């Protein structure tokens, strides 16, 4: 074994994870590559793209990098556990009138757990991924912080990783920009990686048609929920909709209703199959409750009011807020209005570039 240690690298076949593996190999680590097959397009009725996540082409791309550098590469089939946890949860959340974030679930409960189990079997000291984030040890805690490249930062999707997992995690790309990664790949002759398009879709909904996914996943759902009422915030019925699972908070397009002015989905009421509509200002909230907390920088914040920049979705710049842990939940008071807070999405709290912790949005509120 290398003096620096043995590291198991998650390799998707994309440029980021491939360059992460290359960097660690060149730094003298004993690298083992692992590609996780999480699902397949045909069984789930999605697009049958040959170059997407988990495709044969992507698996071969990862293997070719390993072969060219002389380190072993393994393929691990985790479709069953991915389906049982991530896909079933995604489906259930929409049926509960919430808006899920499967990537956070996958990172926390599937990728890291799978990597660490295999790492232990292979006597690996560390695991590594191609995420744009950083991790460090401070005050007996392992702290996640933003990647140097703000445009590519992925810390929002990593808040759910446990302290034990973080203690063995490496993010080789955290201190680099995407332009650096492309340059490194080009310098080493990996032009296929440089020219490879990136995917920003949910991997098991590759056509981005979550409505179609739900219909395929739940035969008879469409008939069961069709015909519910669109109502205004004062309860006035203004039309019929296709079923509450097919709408999300903040949605404006695809409502199929014309009122003479723009309206948005402000609330989803599963219990009576109602979708509440309102003007844009009706999306404004200045507080929320977050549950299922996992803390990074601090063990807990019980009884402590702390200033934070809080993100309520992936592409959110964040909003200044005061957070206070109450029992097992976080009460968040924003210093200005935030639009379209969707229950089921992840909320992540930042102190500077550091992740304080995160959880799942339970509910939002508006107070004077």
UniProtKB/Swiss-Prot annotation:
Q: List the disulfide bonds.
A: 106-203
Could you tell me what reaction this enzyme catalyses?
S-sulfanyl-L-cysteinyl-[protein] + uridine(34) in tRNA + AH2 + ATP = 2-thiouridine(34) in tRNA + L-cysteinyl-[protein] + A + AMP + diphosphate + H(+)
Source domain of life is: Bacteria
Q: Name one GO cellular component term.
A: cytoplasm
The record's listing under Gene3D superfamilies reads: Adenine nucleotide alpha hydrolases-like domains (2.30.30.280), HUPs (3.40.50.620), Translation factors (2.40.30.10)
Q: Does the keyword ATP-binding apply?
A: yes
| MF terms in GO | ATP binding; tRNA binding; tRNA-uridine 2-sulfurtransferase activity
Which residue ranges are recorded for the region named Interaction with tRNA? 152-154, 313-314
Q: What is its EC number?
A: 2.8.1.13
Q: Single Gene Ontology BP term?
A: tRNA wobble position uridine thiolation
Q: Which UniProt keywords apply?
A: ATP-binding, Cytoplasm, Disulfide bond, Nucleotide-binding, RNA-binding, Transferase, tRNA processing, tRNA-binding
* Pfam families for the chain: tRNA_Me_trans, tRNA_Me_trans_C, tRNA_Me_trans_M
Role played: Catalyzes the 2-thiolation of uridine at the wobble position (U34) of tRNA, leading to the formation of s(2)U34.
Which HAMAP family does the record match to this protein?
A: tRNA_thiouridyl_MnmA
Q: Its family?
A: Belongs to the MnmA/TRMU family.
Protein name (record):
tRNA-specific 2-thiouridylase MnmA
Organism of derivation: Cytophaga hutchinsonii (strain ATCC 33406 / DSM 1761 / CIP 103989 / NBRC 15051 / NCIMB 9469 / D465)
């Amino acid at each position: 074994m290398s003096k620096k240690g043995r590291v198991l690298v998650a390799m998707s076949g994309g440029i980021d994870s491939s360059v992460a593996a290359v960097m660690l190999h060149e730094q003298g680590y004993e690298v083992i590559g692992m590609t996780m097959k999480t699902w397949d397009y045909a069984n789930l009725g999605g697009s049958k793209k040959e170059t997407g996540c988990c495709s044969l082409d992507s698996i071969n791309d990862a293997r070719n990098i390993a072969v060219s550098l002389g380190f072993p590469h393994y393929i691990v089939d985790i479709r069953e556990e991915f389906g049982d946890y991530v896909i079933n949860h995604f489906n259930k959340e929409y049926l509960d009138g919430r808006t899920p974030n499967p990537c956070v679930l996958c990172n926390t409960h599937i990728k890291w757990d799978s990597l660490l189990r295999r790492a232990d079997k292979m006597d690996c000291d560390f695991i590594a991924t191609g995420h744009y984030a950083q991790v460090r040890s401070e005050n007996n805690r392992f702290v996640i912080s933003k990647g140097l490249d703000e445009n590519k930062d992925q810390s929002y999707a990593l808040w759910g990783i446990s302290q034990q997992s973080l203690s063995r995690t490496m993010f080789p790309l955290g201190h680099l920009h995407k332009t650096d990664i492309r340059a490194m790949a080009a310098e080493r002759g990996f032009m296929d990686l440089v020219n490879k398009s990136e995917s920003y879709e949910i991997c098991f909904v590759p056509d981005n048609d979550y409505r179609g996914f739900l219909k395929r996943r739940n035969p008879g759902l469409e008939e069961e929920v069709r015909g519910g009422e669109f109502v205004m915030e004062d309860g006035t019925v203004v039309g019929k909709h296709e079923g509450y699972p097919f709408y999300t908070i903040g949605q404006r397009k695809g409502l199929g209703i014309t009122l003479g002015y723009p309206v948005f989905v402000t609330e989803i009421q599963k219990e009576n199959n109602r979708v509440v509509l309102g003007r844009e200002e009706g999306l404004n909230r200045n507080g929320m409750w977050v549950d299922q907390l996992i803390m990074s920088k601090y063990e807990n914040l019980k009884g402590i009011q702390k200033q934070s920049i809080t993100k309520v979705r992936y592409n959110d710049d964040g909003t200044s807020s005061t957070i206070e842990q109450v029992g097992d939940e976080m009460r968040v008071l924003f210093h200005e209005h935030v639009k379209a807070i969707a229950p089921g999405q992840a909320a992540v709290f930042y102190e500077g570039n550091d992740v304080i912790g995160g959880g799942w949005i339970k509910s939002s509120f508006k107070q004077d």
